[in-house]
UniProtKB/Swiss-Prot annotation:
One of its GO terms (cellular component) is membrane. Heme binds at C479. GO terms for molecular function: heme binding; iron ion binding; oxidoreductase activity, acting on paired donors, with incorporation or reduction of molecular oxygen, reduced flavin or flavoprotein as one donor, and incorporation of one atom of oxygen. The lineage of its organism: Eukaryota, Fungi, Dikarya, Ascomycota, Saccharomycotina. Together with an NADPH cytochrome P450 the enzyme system catalyzes the terminal hydroxylation as the first step in the assimilation of alkanes and fatty acids. The chain crosses the membrane at residues 10-30, 44-64. This is Cytochrome P450 52E1. Belongs to the cytochrome P450 family. Keywords: Heme, Iron, Membrane, Metal-binding, Monooxygenase, Oxidoreductase, Transmembrane, Transmembrane helix. Pfam families: p450.
Length: 519
């Protein structure tokens, strides 16, 4: 039977009417009574076009134009409250910016939540690792990895020093215009692979980057691995955005990229398993993957964990360094103050490598890093899925001060980016880069739940000290070598504090950070 266009529209209208009716019935006759029984009150409910399709279109458009984080902040602000329901692509999300609610999800009621569909989204590349697993699998991964990120291990700066100096001498010192963000991605993958595998991808050295390694499935170069890793992460980020419909995002290029990454990592895995480290080598040099072989001989476990750590070790630190450079160029007075402090505390040359403790004690440096992480947290958007009926402490009722019922299966979304820019917490200049705010009494809140650039609770980032150490040392070396940073990014000219940001799994500066380092 063939139906006419008018009949098709009529059927579509009927289907949409049923969807609207279902939303109404669910919230007022199913959700609300269950919430009341638990002493909870419903939060604000933002009803949108059925399935939230217009919102999805705006969401996708904002992402394509590198304006997603600002769009989400505006959309949340339009709710007029800080906890409420919104619908996107047929998925009902409980959105919150309340520190107490986020604390409950990540810490107080940690056992009530899982990563939801994140495991399925990322499994193709990352496998069973610390960033994909929940429950007992996650506990085992964390127990396996925690010793590898002890203070003693992350405070070894000599291997970082080699790659940082290579970047400065080969790419920064000539006074040429460079994309600092691209070079920071090279730096962090080189230092991360050195830490993980004992051998670097050497992407900052074109000659070494072209040398192939004999993986189980053929030769692969460090440059090929870096490109494949970036390509695979691009696809994963789109999958995260579309959520439960992630399975629609499938491309042959993704699987080819995964195979290149796995082949590259497997070279180091099988090498580590075949050649145990000698006692004198153990004392001389720390290598993550070799230490892991002392805990397990399963090559798949080692590969998955190494890839998970590599994800965190590269993109988050590169993003942090990129935004630091942007702001230091946009605010020359801040750079002048920072450089004066660095030269006073560390000297003007790289004769001696600073210690982990010295870097942490440089207050001006740490204030700059804290402020950048406030404005640009490593993972600005995140979510958890309830695995049991549970509740949040605040956000319900007409005044938003009553508990909120979270039914099993409900996704709870939180934006660290938006929360860390709230004017009621950080003042009227919350969106402005001002490092000296960390000299004020409210600095104590840095240990609270309104400032969680590395997440919080049991799943707090294991590698945060590694990232902070690398970022700190890199900025110290830049200050020692250059009197001024000239950022040619167009946003510096129009508005220093409203730069476009490209949101994928982590955030980066849209268009790179086009820079000239001046001696």
């Amino acid at each position: 039977m063939i139906i006419g266009l008018s009949d098709a529209f009529a059927l579509g209208g009927i289907a949409l009417s049923f969807l609207v009716a279902y939303q109404f019935i669910y919230f007022y006759f199913i959700y609300s009574p269950r919430a009341k029984k638990l002493g909870c009150a419903p939060p604000v409910i933002v009803f949108s076009f059925p399935l939230g399709l217009p919102a999805l279109y705006k969401f996708a458009t904002a992402m394509l134009h590198d304006n997603l984080l600002e769009y989400i902040s505006i959309r949340i602000a339009d709710m007029k409250v800080r906890t409420g329901f919104q619908t996107l692509a047929g998925q009902r999300w409980l959105v919150t910016l309340e520190p107490e609610n986020i604390k409950t999800v990540l810490a107080t009621s940690f056992k009530d939540y899982s990563l939801g569909f994140r495991y399925d989204i990322m499994y193709g590349l990352l496998g069973n690792g610390i960033f994909t697993l929940s429950g007992d699998g996650w506990k085992h991964s964390r127990a396996l990895l925690r010793p590898q990120f002890s203070r003693e291990q992350v405070s070894h700066l000599e291997s970082m020093r080699t790659h940082i100096n290579l970047m400065i001498n080969n790419h920064f010192k000539g006074g040429q215009v460079v994309d600092a963000q691209a070079l920071y991605h090279n730096l962090t993958i080189d230092t991360a692979t050195e830490f993980l595998f004992g051998e670097s991808t050497n992407t900052l050295d074109p000659d070494l980057a072209q040398q192939g390694l004999p993986g189980p499935k053929g030769l692969v170069t460090g440059e090929q691995f870096a490109e494949a890793f970036t390509s695979a992460l691009e696809i994963l980020s789109v999958r995260v955005i579309v959520g439960a419909a992630w399975f629609l995002i499938w491309t042959p290029k993704f699987w080819r990229s995964c195979k290149v990454c796995h082949n590259f990592i497997d070279y180091f895995v099988y090498k580590a398993l075949a050649t145990p480290m000698e006692k004198d080598q153990e004392a001389d040099r720390y290598v993550f993957i070799r230490e892991l072989t002392k805990e397990t001989s399963d090559p798949r476990v080692i590969r998955d964990q190494a890839l998970n750590i590599l994800l965190a070790g590269r993109d988050t630190t590169a993003g942090l360094l990129s935004f630091i450079t942007y702001y230091l160029g946009a605010y020359p007075e801040v750079y002048a103050e920072l450089r004066e402090a660095v030269l006073s505390e560390f000297g003007s040359t790289d004769v001696e490598t600073p210690t982990f403790e010295q870097l942490k004690q440089c207050k001006v440096l740490q204030n700059v890093i804290r402020e950048v992480l406030r404005l640009h947290p490593n993972v600005p958007l995140n979510f958890r899925q309830a695995i049991v009926d549970t509740k949040l402490p605040t956000g319900g009722g007409p005044n938003g001060d009553q508990p909120v019922f979270v039914p099993k299966g409900q996704n709870v979304f939180y934006s660290t980016y938006s929360m860390q820019r709230r004017t009621d917490i950080w003042g009227p200049d919350a969106t402005t880069f001002r490092p000296d705010r960390w000299n004020e009494p409210r600095e104590a809140l840095a240990s609270g739940w309104d400032y969680i650039p590395f997440n919080g609770g049991p799943r707090i980032c294991l590698g945060q000290q590694f990232a902070l150490t690398e970022a700190s040392y890199t900025i110290v070396r830049i200050c020692q070598e250059f009197s001024r940073i000239e950022v040619l990014h167009p946003d510096v000219i129009t508005s220093k504090n409203s730069m476009k940001q490209r949101m994928r799994l982590t955030q980066t500066a849209s268009g790179g950070v086009i820079t000239r380092f001046i001696r």
